[in-house]
Amino acid sequence: MRKRTFLGASLALGLGGFSGLVAPSTQAKPAGSKSFHGRGEILWDTYGVPHVYGKDEAAVFYGFGYAQAQNHGNIVVHLYGEARGRAAEYWGPQFADSDRWMLSNDVPARALAWYRASTPQFRQNLDAFAAGINAYDAANPGKIDPKVAVVLPVSGVDVMAHAHRLMNFIYVAPMERTMGAPVPGAGNNGSNAWAVAPSKSQSGHTMLLANPHLPWPTSYFTYFEADLNGPGIKMYGATQVGLPVLRFCFNDHMGFTNTVNSMLGATNYELKLSGDGYLFDGKVLPFKTRTTSFKIRQPDGALKTETLTIRESVHGPAFTRADGKTLALRVAGLDRPDGLKQYWDMGMSKNFAEFETILKRLQVPTFNIVYADKAGHIQYMDNGVLPKHPKGDLAYWRGDVPGDTSATLWTDVHSYDELPKVIDPATGWIQNTNDPPWVATYPQVIHAENFPPYVAPPGPESLRSQQSAHLLADPSKISFDDFVARKLSTHTLMADRVLPDLIAAAQGDPDPEVQAAVNLLKAWNRETVADSKAALLFETWANRFSPGNFTSLANYKVKWLPSDPIGTPKGVADPAKALDMLKAAIGEMKTKYGAIDRPFGEVSRFAIDKVDLPGNGGFGNTGIFRTITWGPLKDGKRIPVHGETWVSLVEFSTPIKAKGLMSYGNASQPGSPHRSDQLKHLSDKTLRTLWTTRAQVEQHIEGRTPF
């Protein structure tokens, strides 16, 4: 069966000139482990979830680092090597572009500066996390792939460098966007988040859903579930591998989650070159230049040294693309070293006053943040470090901005008070599925016209976001069981909007195959589940009706309307054309699947290693809340490439109730039993009880690791 693959972090883009500061030639001292003897233990439950118990804060970080190395060591250590800007030295020329990007954007050097700028306690925490990784390798020689282990030992600076790279130069300013290549996963990445207030809850308790969607191949996007405990420390949730803090987190008092937002924290400035310089406000300015070097391992194992010329304009580091354009990159938030500490403090908070005070630091450079607490408060925030601009909308600032004038050079960013947010709405609920902030609840309480046009586009609202709102907007109060059931919904909203018109258009067609298709679609309950015999047919037709990953509105009778943001688009503009699309879809179904009524789960499989189960869920842009992005057909089957990853649903009762799932399992190391052991839940549309207390954990122990 399929194995989980590694999503390459470097693309061959033919990078030209580079700019930035030279990386330090030495790494920080590797983190040791002797001082942690007798300071804690890890209880491993039967799903491979580490429950870390430390005698102090640093010991908790140490245990968390050890646990990540045990379950995901190959990925974590590889990512740290990439963040050093030395991946080509370790693994060859396919990583040279990545190294150039790291060095040109000063990631290794800035990581060292950020590490030094951290509080003494948080530096200890970073060192402890790294020490845990090193300790796992020392205690288990050979478990981490020797080709990857060349990076070891790691240090607290490596931890900071990876976080800096991930946040600022993958999420905020990915290499591909500057260099003119498609950003990997840009059309699919997403998440779901809900918060329900006591007024909307049947029990009178607040509820929170965390449900990120990211690629399934192992990479910096892979999630890891953990339970962290110590004096004054109690937090449960998930994070991306290599990070020492939880990004999706709850405790007994509150919880928060993230979704990717459209906030644009980086600008590409197109430079007009003149001689050896560039034009700026009518003058020719020289580039600041310097050189550094890095090593590239050759196929025979020899190391070749490459000299890197680094150029910098008034905007930032300059790059020459394959199309001949020279662009300078300006990234907001590079003066904010405490993003990791902010996440840690968010997880340590006990109430909304504490949480909001922490949010106001604006150290986390991007992401929507959705919050809920036991006292009944809920919040949505379009969070990030957002540059202030005098004009222009999001599309303008996402493009190549003229760099020959100071009129476009931003120098300030928006404050917390200036960013869109919804706090304790009268509706009693909040949602976000990566769409603009304006329908965080409905009826709307914030509006695009009250914010600069570069904050977020006014619309359209995606069908997944509309379905999310519909799942919460009915007048009934929601029990926890109903909360779970709504989250597991596989209903296809797009079918509600267009199937009546399509069926009407096809009803009188004399072709018996068309009538067979009509009968399938009429009988379909519009659920994308394993035994559905019409879901694949509808998906195949919908891909023609709404091309561009199901985003085109051209064939709808009624386009998306700001006045009806969760009721449009709808209808079929040209019934005859839609019928032709159905006939083409019938032919495609017969060619690809052998019949027009293949059960969805025969073709769509949840398969990792030797586990191969019927799938459910589908493309978010068809209005399915349970998002699974299916990969290309291979040997008559397809598997997820993106979608449902970490899920947690929490009711802040006494004690709290928590359900969850890590779709692809909580480990990626070869031979781990936890690489695929949760796929059965995913296939059955069920969730696990999350064991949040020591008493619960003790009943489900698979192993103990004292330290």
Give short role names for the model-derived ranges:
Residues 21-30:
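Signal peptide processing junction and immediate N-terminal pro/mature segment
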Residues 14-15, 363:
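Residue-level detector of secondary-structure transition/capping positions
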Residues 29-510, 523-707:
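C-terminal/peripheral segments of proteins
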Residues 1-14:
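N-terminal secretory signal peptides and thylakoid transit peptides that target proteins
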